[in-house]
Protein backbone atom coordinates (compact mmCIF):
# COMPACT_ATOMS: atom_id res chain seq x y z
CA UNK A 1 0.00 0.00 0.00
CA UNK A 2 2.76 2.48 0.88
CA UNK A 3 4.55 1.72 -2.37
CA UNK A 4 1.38 2.47 -4.38
CA UNK A 5 0.95 5.85 -2.66
CA UNK A 6 4.64 6.66 -3.16
CA UNK A 7 4.43 5.81 -6.87
CA UNK A 8 1.36 8.05 -7.20
CA UNK A 9 3.20 11.00 -5.63
CA UNK A 10 6.34 10.44 -7.71
CA UNK A 11 4.25 10.48 -10.88
CA UNK A 12 2.10 13.42 -9.80
CA UNK A 13 5.06 15.65 -8.99
CA UNK A 14 7.23 14.34 -11.84
CA UNK A 15 10.17 13.51 -9.60
CA UNK A 16 11.83 11.41 -12.28
CA UNK A 17 13.45 9.02 -9.82
CA UNK A 18 12.36 5.58 -8.82
CA UNK A 19 11.84 4.99 -5.14
CA UNK A 20 10.84 2.16 -2.91
CA UNK A 21 9.54 1.68 0.59
CA UNK A 22 11.04 -1.19 2.54
CA UNK A 23 9.71 -2.66 5.79
CA UNK A 24 12.48 -3.02 8.35
CA UNK A 25 12.49 -4.36 11.89
CA UNK A 26 12.06 -0.84 13.27
CA UNK A 27 9.59 0.66 10.82
CA UNK A 28 9.82 1.73 7.19
CA UNK A 29 12.70 3.03 5.11
CA UNK A 30 12.47 5.05 1.90
CA UNK A 31 15.04 4.21 -0.77
CA UNK A 32 15.44 7.02 -3.33
CA UNK A 33 18.35 8.17 -5.46
CA UNK A 34 20.72 5.68 -3.87
CA UNK A 35 19.98 7.01 -0.40
CA UNK A 36 18.12 5.38 2.45
CA UNK A 37 15.92 7.53 4.70
CA UNK A 38 14.09 6.22 7.78
CA UNK A 39 10.45 7.30 7.86
CA UNK A 40 9.17 8.72 11.16
CA UNK A 41 5.37 8.49 10.93
CA UNK A 42 4.87 9.02 14.66
CA UNK A 43 5.81 12.68 14.16
CA UNK A 44 2.57 13.21 12.25
CA UNK A 45 0.17 11.85 14.84
CA UNK A 46 -2.15 14.67 15.82
CA UNK A 47 -1.56 14.35 19.57
CA UNK A 48 2.17 14.96 19.09
CA UNK A 49 1.84 17.78 16.56
CA UNK A 50 -0.68 19.57 18.78
CA UNK A 51 1.58 19.24 21.83
CA UNK A 52 4.52 20.58 19.84
CA UNK A 53 2.38 23.49 18.64
CA UNK A 54 1.35 24.36 22.22
CA UNK A 55 4.99 24.45 23.27
CA UNK A 56 6.20 26.45 20.28
CA UNK A 57 3.44 29.09 20.30
CA UNK A 58 3.75 29.78 24.03
CA UNK A 59 0.44 28.24 25.15
CA UNK A 60 2.51 26.08 27.51
CA UNK A 61 5.62 27.67 29.03
CA UNK A 62 8.25 26.83 31.62
CA UNK A 63 8.51 23.17 30.71
CA UNK A 64 10.96 21.31 32.93
CA UNK A 65 10.21 17.66 32.12
CA UNK A 66 8.73 15.43 29.43
CA UNK A 67 7.54 11.92 30.17
CA UNK A 68 7.16 9.27 27.47
CA UNK A 69 5.91 5.75 28.01
CA UNK A 70 5.55 2.83 25.64
CA UNK A 71 4.35 -0.74 26.00
CA UNK A 72 5.14 -2.72 22.85
CA UNK A 73 4.74 -6.34 21.74
CA UNK A 74 7.74 -8.59 22.38
CA UNK A 75 8.52 -8.91 18.65
CA UNK A 76 9.36 -5.19 18.31
CA UNK A 77 13.06 -4.58 19.01
CA UNK A 78 13.71 -2.56 22.16
CA UNK A 79 16.19 -0.37 20.25
CA UNK A 80 13.46 0.81 17.86
CA UNK A 81 11.15 1.65 20.76
CA UNK A 82 13.92 3.65 22.45
CA UNK A 83 14.73 5.42 19.18
CA UNK A 84 11.07 6.35 18.69
CA UNK A 85 10.57 7.67 22.23
CA UNK A 86 13.77 9.74 22.19
CA UNK A 87 12.77 11.14 18.80
CA UNK A 88 9.35 12.08 20.18
CA UNK A 89 10.92 13.94 23.11
CA UNK A 90 13.18 15.81 20.67
CA UNK A 91 10.34 16.50 18.22
CA UNK A 92 7.81 17.76 20.77
CA UNK A 93 10.25 20.02 22.63
CA UNK A 94 12.32 21.11 19.64
CA UNK A 95 15.46 20.45 21.71
CA UNK A 96 18.38 18.08 21.17
CA UNK A 97 19.53 15.44 23.65
CA UNK A 98 22.58 16.42 25.71
CA UNK A 99 23.02 13.29 27.83
CA UNK A 100 21.32 9.96 28.57
CA UNK A 101 21.39 7.51 31.48
CA UNK A 102 19.70 4.12 31.01
CA UNK A 103 18.57 1.50 33.50
CA UNK A 104 17.36 -1.80 32.10
CA UNK A 105 16.07 -5.22 33.03
CA UNK A 106 17.17 -7.64 30.36
CA UNK A 107 16.14 -6.70 26.84
CA UNK A 108 12.44 -6.01 27.44
CA UNK A 109 12.30 -3.17 29.97
CA UNK A 110 14.26 0.05 30.27
CA UNK A 111 14.02 3.44 31.92
CA UNK A 112 15.91 6.32 30.33
CA UNK A 113 16.68 9.66 31.86
CA UNK A 114 17.72 12.15 29.18
CA UNK A 115 18.69 15.77 29.57
CA UNK A 116 17.67 17.98 26.66
CA UNK A 117 19.03 21.39 25.73
CA UNK A 118 17.87 24.05 28.18
CA UNK A 119 17.93 21.61 31.10
CA UNK A 120 14.66 19.88 30.22
CA UNK A 121 14.50 16.34 31.61
CA UNK A 122 12.99 13.55 29.53
CA UNK A 123 11.82 10.46 31.40
CA UNK A 124 11.26 7.53 29.06
CA UNK A 125 9.78 4.22 30.25
Residue ranges and their predicted role:
Residues 2-75:
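A contiguous active-site-proximal alpha/beta segment in oxidoreductase catalytic domains
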